[in-house]
């Protein structure tokens, strides 16, 4: 047992070259938390007997009950390497003790915002893949997120015990299934990799892939076996590693290596990987599971495994676990892989700095981040808030990218909307104290230097969810995180007892702090709305709200889906609107924006903050826009960054720039609440064709222009074939063959469209992918389990907005029904106003 003290960890924090910040990411139920256990156990925090069952990083009660991870949890581990291994590390190191900051993240797609928060503060990722199920939809999503943050992956193929015990595969089959998994991971990596990272594909022969079983607590990399055999055969370890994977065969008669499958007589040879790596494992499994009492001691002696007194009495799975743990301890393989192949903060920040920092790449803050310099000004990014045991207070959880954070230090707390040189969204306050996050516990420390992950007390009142802490006055913010999911499911929350209202408001504030991807706001009709990414996410949020954050009984409305309003054609005539004092007129037309441009805006490829000339170049080259139009984009809306645009197509209008601010403000308002049923607009482009303004400045103030622009936008919108869009989930369902029929019948009832259906080679499992409207997804999981006898497991992730083909203005159609119901709920008049209501005659 390595019992270590906080002082030891603190002293290691200064050796930046010996730190590894990494997160564990994977598809749901591929065994992240279970695998993390074996690492935690090595650090001496939980006993060996519990490892694999304790799921130490699942700290919440509901996480233990449901058996899923909901929040990402951080823990620091201490590890030592032999001098021989340290020599093989490709980057600078000092000494042979290492500090590993590990974050166990959720795999369930509803919580992928937690994964984003975890990835931002780490430099490497351990991607866990299930041998039997292979690479799934969520594996791809999290890998894509990681590579987008320039994070280097290593892979662990987990649940090998399932392949051996449940499926009883042969050695060659297992090799093929490993090879397939490796290949599909590399395909994803090469698709999304960033040139700056270099080649980050994973190769078993280089030791960047481990194979093992988290439940049984064993794992190996090819390097470990190469170590054993290179001593025995007297060969160089590097050469041995290359031979233990791929098409290389060893001929025991001639004692020669070949890359042909047969020897000279045409007899088939056994693949080196099967012979040297899998064979001992298969033999142990068969001897122990078939209770061959006489073979076991011989095998153990050969493999140099010593059992203690009472361990000799065990049999079956219990014995198997102990033997495999002694033969190939999981922690050794994983720690070796993490330390040798993942970058230290010094290495990583060098290439991640430009992507993390919003300002220019030559200002002092960016240079300090690049060098990971503990003596520079402080730059710290808070990626999420963690609730403390004391109700209502939070630790700010983040990473020091430069400088050193000390208890009691005065810092500038910059929220996400802070602009250098202004005073908005900025507080200057002292950090009360710094703590080290250890799963369920925290340990106070005095200070924390660059490259480490830390929790801060006393900052929570000044930040909503994320932000930058710095001591350098000219510092820009660290870039805001891009979430791959968006909150599309909403419910209205009311209190049962009117006296509890203030508690609800306070609780909603705390809820929106504690979860990076939940939205809380108040609607026009005075309801409190909570929006989440899916059914499960919402359920957990509301349960937290009721039990922890507000602590009062609540009434919750049935879930409602967020829609978008859009147009399909160009306005059939020019929309004209006059100001209230009849002295100003705005003429405009609305038209649709191509889906790919909307997606590019939503993904941040076309950015409102970019230089307008560069942006116009991109839009002209990649999306076929007219350059003059692209240069004259006045604003994005709603919220200044949505997928709707105002383009100035006027010619020689006097005083035009004076009304620009008013027009922008009006468009933000109009695009946030569309004319059909008060939902946000999407993919609408408004071209201002002409403006007539009064010569006297007093008659063309905001009060005249804003309502005019809004009315004109609505009129143009309603003249351009308005439609509504509904959000659509991509569902991936894994199931055995006999359950496929049940899936189709449920999908048909729910307006789902099947996209693909394929069988995983070497397994009886089928993977069905389908599009399912979010509106129909409530209770989908339950119905699916009923129809398939509990054999199908759906994973739903928001995929795209789909336009409903029917006319939303006609109450008899499907779209019209949705509109009427929503207008009733919002307390508006039931029929949608016609364009005439917003259009003014000359």
UniProtKB/Swiss-Prot annotation:
Diphthamide PTM sites in chain numbering: 699
* Superkingdom, taxonomy of origin: Eukaryota
Q: Which residues form the tr-type G domain?
A: 17-253
Give the UniProt family note: Belongs to the TRAFAC class translation factor GTPase superfamily. Classic translation factor GTPase family. EF-G/EF-2 subfamily.
> What Pfam families does the record tag this protein with?
EFG_C, EFG_III, EFG_IV, GTP_EFTU, GTP_EFTU_D2
Which of UniProt's keywords are assigned here?
Cytoplasm, Elongation factor, GTP-binding, Nucleotide-binding, Protein biosynthesis
Organism for this UniProt entry:
Lachancea kluyveri (strain ATCC 58438 / CBS 3082 / BCRC 21498 / NBRC 1685 / JCM 7257 / NCYC 543 / NRRL Y-12651) (Yeast)
Return one GO MF term: ribosome binding
Q: Where does GTP bind?
A: 26-33, 104-108, 158-161
List localization entries: Cytoplasm
Q: Would you tell me the protein name for this molecule?
A: Elongation factor 2
Q: Which SUPFAM superfamilies match?
A: EF-G C-terminal domain-like, P-loop containing nucleoside triphosphate hydrolases, Ribosomal protein S5 domain 2-like, Translation proteins
Which gene is the coding source of this polypeptide chain? Answer: EFT2
Q: Which InterPro entries match?
A: EFG_II, EFG_III/V, EFG_V-like, EFTu-like_2, G_TR_CS, P-loop_NTPase, Ribosomal_Su5_D2-typ_SF, Ribsml_uS5_D2-typ_fold_subgr
GO cellular component annotations of the record: cytosol; ribonucleoprotein complex
Whether Cytoplasm counts among this entry's keywords is yes
NCBIfam families found in the cross-reference section: small_GTP (TIGR00231)
Is RNA-binding among the key words of this record? Answer: no
Give the protein's biological function: Catalyzes the GTP-dependent ribosomal translocation step during translation elongation. During this step, the ribosome changes from the pre-translocational (PRE) to the post-translocational (POST) state as the newly formed A-site-bound peptidyl-tRNA and P-site-bound deacylated tRNA move to the P and E sites, respectively. Catalyzes the coordinated movement of the two tRNA molecules, the mRNA and conformational changes in the ribosome.
